[in-house]
C-alpha cells in the first residue's frame, strides 16, 4: 500500500469482518511521522458509520494529523467485548502500516464519542484486552458510558427504558454479567495522557459516568486526566462541531493531540 499526502483512502481492511474497514485522511502538507489520530463513531452499540463523521477526518488532516475513521462490529450480532477488540485491531493495523501513511507509530491517539468512547475506554484502561506490546500516546473520551452496571441498576433514575435498547443488545440481558464490562470498576492500566469530556446538555448518565471515571482514575489509579465541560453542547453536537466555525471543542482536542505527540 502506498499513499500520497492529501489523499483520502476509503475502506481499508483492518480485519476479516465486513465492518472491519477504515478511512484515512492525510494532511496536504509535506512531512512524515505525523501524529495518528483515530476517531471511533457513536451509535449506541447498535448503529453508526464512519462516514457520519467525515467532518472529523477532514478537520484532523487540516490540523496535520493522519486521521483515521474506523467502523467496528455492532450489536446484537457482536457483543462485549467486540468493540474494544476492534479498537485494538485498528491500533495493530496502524502500528504495522504507519510508515506507509506518513504517521508515527509511537504517536497514536485514540478517541471516540458515545459508544465509541466506551470501546476506547475499555481497550485503553483494561489491560486484559491489550496485547503485550500495547503502547499509545494518549486517548480522548467524549460523552461515553463507562459503567453499564450502574446504568442497569439506575434505569429509573436515568430514564432508561426497559428493555434497554442500547445496553442489552451489546452486554446481554443478565445484569450479573455487566460488572465485568464496567470499565470504572476494572481499570488496571498504567497511567497515560487522557482527556475525558462531557457536554452541558449531555444525557445525565453520561455526565455522571464522566465524573465517576475521572474520580476513580485520580483517587485509585494514579492518573492525572484532563476533564473538560463542553459548554452549550449536547450529546451529538460536540463531534459535529469539529471542522466548523465553532472551535470550542476542536481547539481543545487539537491541542491535546499535539501534547500527546510531543510526549
Language-model-derived ranges and their functions:
Residues 1-263:
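Alpha/beta-hydrolase superfamily serine-hydrolase fold, recognizing
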Amino acid at each position: 500500500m502506498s499513499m500520497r499526502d492529501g489523499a483520502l483512502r476509503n475502506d481499508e481492511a483492518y480485519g476479516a469482518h465486513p465492518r472491519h474497514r477504515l478511512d484515512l485522511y492525510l494532511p496536504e502538507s509535506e512531512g512524515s511521522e505525523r501524529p495518528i489520530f483515530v476517531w471511533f463513531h457513536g451509535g449506541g452499540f447498535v448503529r453508526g458509520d464512519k462516514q457520519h463523521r467525515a467532518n472529523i477526518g477532514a478537520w484532523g488532516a487540516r490540523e496535520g494529523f493522519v486521521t483515521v475513521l474506523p467502523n467496528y462490529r455492532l450489536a446484537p450480532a457482536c457483543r462485549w467485548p467486540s468493540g474494544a477488540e476492534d479498537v485494538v485491531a485498528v491500533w495493530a493495523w496502524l502500528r504495522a502500516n504507519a510508515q506507509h501513511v506518513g504517521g508515527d507509530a509511537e504517536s497514536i491517539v485514540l478517541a471516540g464519542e458515545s459508544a465509541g468512547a466506551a470501546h476506547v475506554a475499555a481497550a485503553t484502561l483494561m489491560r486484559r484486552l491489550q496485547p503485550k506490546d500495547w503502547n499509545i500516546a494518549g486517548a480522548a473520551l467524549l460523552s461515553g458510558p463507562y459503567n453499564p452496571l450502574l446504568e442497569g441498576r439506575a434505569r429509573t433514575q436515568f430514564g432508561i427504558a426497559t428493555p434497554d435498547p442500547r445496553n442489552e443488545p451489546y452486554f446481554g440481558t443478565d445484569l450479573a454479567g455487566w460488572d465485568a464490562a464496567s470499565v470504572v470498576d476494572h481499570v488496571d492500566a498504567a497511567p497515560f495522557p487522557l482527556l475525558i469530556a462531557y457536554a452541558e446538555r449531555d444525557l445525565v448518565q453520561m455526565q455522571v459516568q464522566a465524573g465517576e471515571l475521572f474520580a476513580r482514575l485520580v483517587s485509585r489509579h494514579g492518573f492525572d486526566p484532563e476533564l473538560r465541560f463542553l459548554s452549550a453542547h449536547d450529546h451529538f453536537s460536540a463531534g459535529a462541531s469539529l471542522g466548523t466555525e465553532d472551535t470550542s471543542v476542536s481547539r481543545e482536542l487539537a491541542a491535546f493531540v499535539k501534547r500527546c505527540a510531543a510526549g
